[in-house]
């Protein structure tokens, strides 16, 4: 029987924290050794962290990365486990690489062949692609080494490893960023890939937040029939160990002979001998964790992104302007779940236009969450501004200027608290507002992290409803769900005076931003032509605001951040 004990170290590194990442790696190494593992797989670029971006241009960063790989190798002395460790190989150029480490030695290095250069990825800016396959032999078992995008490539190098080299297992070191629906997409894809090539797969994904990116984990082991026999937790660190029966590969190939007729490329191959299989005791039962519903998935991604941004950047507490509306309520909920109620501060900043209802809703929410609040009215300061500007504004009617003044006063208050106490200001704008420019630059956009900037308004409501249901009680007051959304910057104001109903707006935005449809195609789906053009024009005209917005968690297939690179100076208008 060909039985391989595989351990996947689904861990949360911090970019540039070589010492901290090494400590995590050593802890995982000890666990794998105690469990009698034959193979231990880490995520992509685990030692330096991912994505390193322009740190790749610093020789000192590359040298530290190499130094800590050697340090890690020393900790494998006299151990029986073979390790695949993600690092940067930078001898004659820079490569996204995996080192094969055992018993104090680096036995070989694999260099990533398929470098993604789309969406949030810029790997061709920093890395040279590898040109050689790497096969690790552990006893009579052959393991092919790949890194992230290598297995997303439809054919190679998976085909050459499985068909050409006859590997029993493809190990994949991954740092695959999250978007809504990505866990099930990834699970189905790897299942299909294993089935098509009749090869088992051990996929180790990173977990945690890095600036706007979230890595969701979901590491898995798939057998040669395409069955996911172990599926890790989402958004949590976990060390997974699986006993993998690799005799299944031959059984599947005999029943389904398609692979005999598949063609492969002629990559050069390096084979590394990593000793014998280990004597094993006991058996590690596989665990397939269930996938969460859509709202829970998004909620946990937002928690992960916020928690890690706060902690990894040295903050302890955050502050939020509480308006009594849905957006600030959801941000407060996410912050409380991510950081604990003692680390979240709420500020109510009422004006003469703020309703009693809004104040009560904000106070009820804060009480339900158990967070401390402060009330700092803006009315006197607002009147002082108007008095100061009276001469300059003489002869002009009140307009959006006076509305934006209120938002900017509130932004000043929050930033003053941030400066005085070291609290990180969380902005509360959603994707619908960021797309259309329905936000005030240096006002409600002022802050350090925009938690829900990639969440459409309709999804803000859905996540809020799910949260109350999950908690089994009304944390977010019902009145916040049912009252018309409003900025309360003048009497009787509602969002729908300037925007289409959010159910309409969000679908137009999704089709235009994420699906890339033209206005004509969107209108053909039943939307009013003028409304579609108005929305796309708002998107174009407000690029300057988005360029100055705080970063926030990416949860969609295309967010306003690393994967949205529109010019500000732009006279192109969508035709219809």
Swiss-Prot record:
Active site residues per record: 44, 112, 148
SUPFAM superfamilies registered for this protein in UniProt: Adenine nucleotide alpha hydrolases-like, Carbon-nitrogen hydrolase
Organism name: Thermotoga maritima (strain ATCC 43589 / DSM 3109 / JCM 10099 / NBRC 100826 / MSB8)
Gene Ontology cellular-component annotations: cytoplasm
Pathway(s) this gene product operates in, as recorded in its UniProt entry: Cofactor biosynthesis; NAD(+) biosynthesis; NAD(+) from deamido-NAD(+) (L-Gln route): step 1/1
Listed Gene3D superfamilies: Carbon-nitrogen hydrolase, HUPs
Catalytic reaction equation(s): deamido-NAD(+) + L-glutamine + ATP + H2O = L-glutamate + AMP + diphosphate + NAD(+) + H(+)
Binding site for L-glutamine: 118, 176, 182
Binding of deamido-NAD(+), residues: 404, 433, 545
Family assignment from sequence similarity: In the C-terminal section; belongs to the NAD synthetase family.
Function: Catalyzes the ATP-dependent amidation of deamido-NAD to form NAD. Uses L-glutamine as a nitrogen source.
Amino-acid positions noted as binding ATP in the UniProt annotation, renumbered to this chain: 321-328, 428
GO annotation terms (biological process): NAD biosynthetic process
Protein name: Glutamine-dependent NAD(+) synthetase
Keywords: ATP-binding, Ligase, NAD, Nucleotide-binding
Residue ranges occupied by any CN hydrolase domain in the UniProt entry: 4-246
UniProt-recorded Gene Ontology molecular function terms: ATP binding; glutaminase activity; NAD+ synthase (glutamine-hydrolyzing) activity; NAD+ synthase activity; nitrilase activity
Ligase as annotated region, ranges: 292-576
Pfam families assigned to the protein according to its UniProt record, in alphabetical order: CN_hydrolase, NAD_synthase
EC number(s) reported in the record: 6.3.5.1
């Amino acid at each position: 029987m060909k039985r391989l004990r595989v351990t996947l170290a689904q861990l949360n590194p911090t970019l540039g924290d070589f010492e901290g990442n090494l400590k995590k790696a050593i802890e995982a190494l000890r666990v794998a050794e105690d469990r009698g593992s034959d193979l231990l797989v880490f995520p992509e670029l685990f030692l330096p962290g991912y994505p390193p971006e322009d740190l790749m241009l610093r020789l000192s960063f590359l040298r530290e990365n190499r130094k800590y790989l050697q340090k890690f190798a020393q900790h494998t002395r006299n151990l029986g486990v073979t390790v695949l460790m993600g690092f940067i190989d930078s001898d004659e150029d820079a490569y996204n690489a995996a080192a094969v480490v055992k018993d104090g030695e680096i036995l070989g290095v694999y260099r990533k062949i398929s470098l993604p250069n789309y969406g949030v990825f810029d790997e061709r800016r920093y890395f040279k692609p590898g040109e050689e396959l790497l096969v690790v032999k552990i006893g009579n078992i052959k393991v092919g080494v790949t890194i992230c995008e290598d297995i997303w490539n439809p054919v190679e190098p998976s085909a050459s490893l499985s068909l050409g080299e006859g590997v029993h297992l493809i190990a994949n070191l991954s740092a695959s960023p999250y978007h809504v629906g990505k866990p099930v997409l990834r699970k189905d894809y790897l299942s299909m890939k294993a089935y098509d090539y009749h090869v088992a797969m051990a996929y180790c994904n990173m977990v945690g937040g890095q600036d706007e990116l979230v890595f969701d984990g979901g590491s898995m082991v798939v057998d040669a029939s395409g069955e996911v026999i172990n599926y890790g937790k989402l958004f949590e660190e976990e060390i997974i160990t699986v006993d993998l029966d690799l005799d299944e590969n031959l059984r599947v190939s005999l029943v389904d002979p398609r692979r005999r007729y598949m063609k492969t490329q002629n990559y050069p191959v390096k084979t590394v001998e990593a000793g014998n299989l280990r004597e094993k005791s006991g058996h590690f039962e596989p665990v397939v964790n269930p996938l969460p519903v859509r709202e829970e998935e998004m909620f946990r991604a937002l928690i992960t992104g916020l928690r890690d941004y706060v902690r990894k950047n040295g903050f302890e507490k955050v502050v939020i302007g509480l308006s009594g509306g849905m957006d600030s309520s959801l941000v407060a909920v996410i912050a409380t779940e991510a950081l604990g109620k003692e680390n979240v501060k709420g500020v109510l900043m009422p004006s003469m236009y703020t309703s009693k209802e809004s104040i009560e809703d904000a106070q009820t929410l804060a009480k339900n969450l158990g967070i401390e609040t402060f009330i700092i009215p803006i009315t006197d300061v607002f009147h002082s501004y108007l008095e100061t500007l009276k001469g300059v504004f003489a002869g002009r009617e009140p307009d959006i200027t006076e509305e934006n003044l209120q938002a900017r006063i509130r932004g000043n208050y929050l930033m003053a608290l941030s400066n005085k106490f070291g609290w990180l200001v969380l902005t509360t704008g959603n994707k619908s507002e960021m797309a259309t420019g329905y936000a005030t630059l240096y006002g409600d956009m002022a802050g350090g992290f925009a938690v829900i900037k990639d969440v459409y308004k309709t999804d803000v409501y859905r996540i809020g409803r799910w949260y109350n249901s999950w908690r089994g009680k009304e944390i977010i007051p019902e009145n916040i769900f049912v009252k018309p959304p409003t900025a309360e910057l003048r009497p009787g104001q509602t969002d729908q005076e300037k925007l289409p109903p959010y159910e309409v707006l969000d679908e137009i935005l999704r089709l235009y931003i994420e699906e890339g449809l033209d206005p004509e195609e969107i209108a053909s789906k039943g939307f009013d032509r003028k409304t579609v053009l108005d929305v796309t024009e708002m998107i174009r005209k407000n690029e300057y605001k988005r360029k100055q917005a705080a970063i926030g968690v990416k949860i969609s297939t295309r967010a306003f951040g690393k994967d949205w690179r529109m010019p500000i100076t732009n006279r192109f208008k969508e035709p219809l």
